[in-house]
A protein has these predicted regions:
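Solvent-exposed loop/turn tips at the surfaces of repeat/solenoid architectures
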Residues: 36-37, 57, 209
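Histidine-rich, glycine-flanked metal-binding segment
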Residues: 28-30, 43-85
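Bacterial signal peptide processing site
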Residues: 23-25
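Bacterial N-terminal signal peptides that target proteins for export
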Residues: 1-11
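C-terminal motif of bacterial Sec signal peptides marking the signal peptidase cleavage site
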Residues: 19-21
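Divalent-metal coordination cores built from histidine and acidic residues
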Residues: 79, 83-84, 88, 105-242
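Short solvent-exposed capping/turn motifs at the termini of beta-strands
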Residues: 39-41
């Protein structure tokens, strides 16, 4: 009987602690509540008069605004007459293509609902400072993934003379592997192959990328066919050069 009494006391204490913790969690304010907003997404019908609860960067609940009483949030936003959509992606961006627009691009993306971007070609010395700015604490900017420079052949199309400087030369397989090592060390998320690459350099890039677990985007090199290139890459950025 003594053992049963002890167990009952322990269970009672445990339950009391759980209830206390739940009460404290319920009272804890969330980060953001957006009220009276119209939701549009790719799966559901248009939903009006909704309250969206967000905490630690995640949506934790979507409820009817008529039932959203006593919501405790650090920030409350009235979305009456406004629309809320999932963040959009721009999968093909060149932040450093024209320096006149570089500084304004992040704000324009967010204004139009783009919250994630992939920069598909830029010299590291130009692009990395932009990435640092976009990722700095408090920056109002989309999340960015980048390839670094266009991996071109012995001749570079975007050479900074005839066109903006976005690409680098890869005259040999050895040069390509060395360039990829530098690009990978600079934090690139994927690689971008360009049009003047020869088949032997292309093969070296694919091999090195697989070794480093780096996805490949690319144009179809002028010396190759799309049917030969497509199985080796994760994305063909332009449907040409067949």
């Amino acid at each position: 009987m003594i053992m049963v009494s002890v167990i009952r006391s322990a269970l009672t204490l445990s339950l009391a602690l759980v209830l206390t913790a739940c009460s404290q969690d319920t009272a804890k304010p969330i980060d953001l509540a957006i009220h009276n907003v119209t939701l549009i997404d790719a799966v559901n019908p248009i939903r009006t008069n909704r309250t969206v609860l967000i905490d630690q960067g995640r949506i934790i609940a979507i409820i009817n605004s008529d039932a959203a009483h006593d919501i405790t949030a650090a920030q409350q936003v009235d979305g009456s007459g406004q629309y809320l959509i999932p963040g959009l992606w721009d999968f093909h961006v060149h932040f450093t293509f024209d320096a006149r627009f570089t500084d304004s691009m992040a704000g324009l993306f967010l204004y139009h609902g783009v919250t994630n971007v992939r920069d598909t070609g830029g010299l590291l010395e130009d692009l990395l400072p932009v990435v640092d700015t976009l990722r700095s604490a408090g920056a109002k900017a989309p999340s960015i993934w980048y390839s670094g420079p266009l991996l071109d052949g012995a001749d570079v199309v975007y050479d900074g003379v005839n066109f903006p400087g976005l690409g680098i030369a890869n005259p040999t397989p050895e040069a390509a592997r060395a360039n990829i090592a530098e690009i990978h060390a600079a934090g690139a998320s994927f690689l971008k192959i360009y049009e003047m690459v020869t088949p032997d350099v292309f093969a070296a890039i694919v091999d090195e990328a697989r070794t480093r677990n780096l996805p490949i985007d690319g144009h179809v090199p002028l010396s190759m066919r799309a049917r030969d290139v497509a199985p080796q890459v994760q994305s063909l950025e332009h449907l040409r050069n067949y």
